Design a protein with these regions (language model features):
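Alpha-helix capping/helix-boundary segments
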Residues: 33, 59-60, 124, 166
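Core dinuclear metal-dependent hydrolase active-site scaffold
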Residues: 1-21, 72-129, 141-146
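Redox-cofactor binding/interface segments in oxidoreductases and associated redox assembly factors
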Residues: 8-9, 27-28, 85-87, 135, ...
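Active-site metal-binding motif and surrounding structural segment of the metallo-beta-lactamase
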Residues: 11-55, 131-134, 155
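Short secondary-structure boundary segments
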Residues: 57, 137, 162-164
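Portal/gating segments that form or line small-molecule/metal binding sites
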Residues: 41-42, 46-92, 177
């Protein structure tokens, strides 16, 4: 039996996680700091020198500026019998005035094991049948009905909520910042 350790989207909302060692791969779905924390990624890679860093195409440049070698996740990558498959291409639309970036969800699969899908920040990717589905609980780009439609569409027997930190203090600040910047100029927030 072989155990592999993967970390997906170690962003700036994961403050209780601390240092993680013995990783085989660090997977980054996109460059937003709640998924790729520029203040932590260098130390994370240093603590895991043998880990491969797979990311969406635009995050390669972000990582390069930090001195971290990342590989654009554009095709299947094997780790022994486990296959990591990129699914999707673009981040969900937040607002017409915010440029869209790349977002690559990840499908983890191995013979005889449950298939796991993490979508990053998009609900339009189609990984095929999965047994374990990570689903964004709350996001500035997502309505509640879109979240429930995502769960219904994939109909996975197991679902793991992700992206829930926006419901805490820092998330409130994020929503208020967007309301201030994008909600019009005739109000004080």
């Amino acid at each position: 039996l072989v155990y592999l350790r993967f970390l997906i989207d170690h962003g700036n909302f994961a403050d209780e996680l601390g240092t993680v060692n013995d990783l085989d791969a660090i997977l980054v779905t996109h460059q937003h700091p709640d998924h790729l924390d520029p203040d932590r990624i260098v130390d994370l890679v240093r603590a895991n020198p043998d880990a491969r860093v797979l990311c969406d195409p635009m995050s390669v440049a972000v990582l390069s500026r930090l001195g971290v070698e990342g590989q654009a996740h554009t095709g299947q990558t094997a780790f022994g019998e486990l296959t990591v498959t990129p699914v999707g291409a673009m981040h969900a639309l937040i607002h017409d005035e915010i440029p869209r970036i790349t977002n690559v969800g990840v499908l983890l699969s191995a013979p005889g094991e449950p298939r796991f899908f993490h979508p990053g920040d998009a609900l339009d990717a189609e990984p095929g049948p999965v047994e374990v589905l990570a689903f964004p609980l709350n996001a500035p780009w997502q309505r509640s009905r879109e979240m429930t439609d995502f769960l219904r569409r994939h109909d996975a027997p197991h679902a793991i909520p992700i992206h829930e930190c926006l419901l805490q203090r820092r998330g409130r600040d994020l929503y208020l910042g967007q309301a201030d910047r994008l909600g019009g100029s005739d109000r004080v927030i």
